[in-house]
Amino acid sequence: MSAASKSIDVMLKPLLVGGRPISNRFVMAPLTRCRADDNHVPTAAMVKHYSDRASMGLIITEATQIQKGYSTFAHEGGIYDKEHVDGWRKVTDAVHDKGGIIFCQIHNGGRSTVPSNVDEGVRIVAPSAVAITGHKCAGSFARNGKTQPYPVPHAMAAEEIASYVNLYAAAARNAIAAGFDGVEVHGANGYLIDQFLKTSSNQRTDEYGGSIENRCRFLFEVLDAVIQAIGRERVGLRISPLNSFNDQSDEDPQALTRYICSQLNLRTIAFLDVMRGDFFSPARGADKWAREEYEGVLFTGMSFEIEEAAKAVESGAADAVVFGTKALANPDLVARAVAGAPLNKPDPATFYTTGEAGYNDYPFM
């Protein structure tokens, strides 16, 4: 055994996730890559991409759209009709054939959606009529390739909120039909659920706004509906209490984190995935708040080096660590970690382009 493998030995231990053992503590982060076809059906390139990374203890897919005609990203995957189910089945079969485990991240963008990606007659929605103003939609995410401002979204009525809860549950059922081992509910990074959670984007005065309990109401209605649809052992949740991406902030992120964790303790889901900090600042600590409060399986991530991840797992600060760009650029990340081999460097210029370049051409050792 190499010195490198000894230092990360704890990362190679199996872990029970929802009653199912995963082979190691390396988790592939949900990474938007925009490689699905025009109808949001997974492509052959996606089959290869995910199956090449089957040695990760758990794969979590890219954010996968739950609603027809509401595309947050051009060429994102969808999970709202049979065509998507059939397409994802090819991915899950390929991952399972290599002994891997894969969850589908189910997602809606809310106000963080490119206007030109939304079908005629479909409204861009959010908890409140508050637009993103800190940046514009990147052309790489748009069907028409044009950079454009975010519009003021439509503030959802109570009956619309209920309809979105149903969309998440339907997407979860479709994911299981497609062969996924479970789903991760996307409650992070300024998308629809996170917009309800944070004070910067939720200015409601009804039962879905104001107090932490009210701002979390939509999250737990979604989570409970998904649990009812597919079983708690197949459900994970991702949150990003400190991340300012998409104009997000909260008046008391620690209290928000602790409340979410206290409520999750009553539900015994498969895992909680907490992004520890902010994309744009050194702020860190959300994982520590979660570990102090949450009694279940805890994943954390955001710019971890491999030995740092091993120390986090060894100390009990996390049960597994989520890797983004390292998994993106290294299909054999686990083997490289064991060997102490150098890692491929990711190419940001190809993160959101279509085709194989920067997607399936990163070499194995």
From Swiss-Prot:
Its cofactor is FMN. It is found in: Cytoplasm, Cytosol. Disruption phenotype: Knockout parasites show reduced replication within macrophages, but are resistant to bicyclic nitro-drugs including delamanid and DNDI-VL-2098. Sensitivity to bicyclic nitro-drugs is fully restored on expression of this reductase. FMN binds at residues 30-32, 63, 105, 238, 303, 324-325. GO terms for molecular function: FMN binding; oxidoreductase activity, acting on the CH-CH group of donors, NAD or NADP as acceptor. It is an enzyme of class 1 (oxidoreductase). SUPFAM superfamilies: FMN-linked oxidoreductases (SSF51395). Keywords: Cytoplasm, Flavoprotein, FMN, NAD, NADP, Oxidoreductase. The active site is at residue 191. Its EC number is 1.3.1.-, 1.7.1.-. It holds the Pfam family Oxidored_FMN. Monomer. This is Probable flavin mononucleotide-dependent alkene reductase. It comes from Leishmania infantum.
